[in-house]
């Protein structure tokens, strides 16, 4: 499962949203979970993060346990979504 955790007012998250939406449009199933105004999603983020990053944006691929802390370029996000390790 692919999850993108974000905050509604987070500028870095807003920068990532077009890339995430593009991948969704191409058929990737990515769960978008707002965490700043949704306590349930905030709890999911805390569990998924496990103290590795401590904030948003946070990308987690549960199939590979790969994660990205913070903003990243499209190539890195694609690698994450495809389960490939990025350089």
Model regions and ranges:
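Local sequence-structure signature of Cys/Sec-based thiol-disulfide redox active-site neighborhoods
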Residues: 1-31
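Stable alpha-helical elements in mature extracytoplasmic
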Residues: 16-19, 41, 73, 77
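Sec-exported extracytoplasmic/periplasmic mature domains
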Residues: 21, 25-28, 50, 82, ...
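Non-catalytic, surface beta->alpha helical segment in thiol-disulfide oxidoreductase systems
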Residues: 58-87
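Disulfide-bonded cysteines in secreted/extracellular proteins and peptides
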Residues: 10-13, 53, 69
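Structural microenvironment flanking redox-active thiols in thiol-disulfide oxidoreductases
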Residues: 35-46
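Structural micro-motif
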Residues: 46-62
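Conserved beta-strand termini and adjacent loop/short-helix elements that scaffold enzyme active sites
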Residues: 33-35, 70
């Amino acid at each position: 499962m692919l999850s993108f955790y974000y905050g509604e007012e987070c500028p870095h998250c807003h920068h990532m949203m077009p890339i995430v939406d593009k991948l969704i449009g191409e058929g990737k199933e990515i769960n978008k979970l707002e965490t700043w105004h949704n306590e349930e999603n905030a709890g999911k983020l805390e569990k998924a993060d496990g103290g590795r990053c401590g904030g948003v944006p946070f990308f987690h691929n549960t199939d590979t346990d790969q994660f990205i802390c913070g903003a990243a370029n499209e190539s890195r996000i694609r690698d994450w979504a495809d389960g490939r390790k990025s350089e």
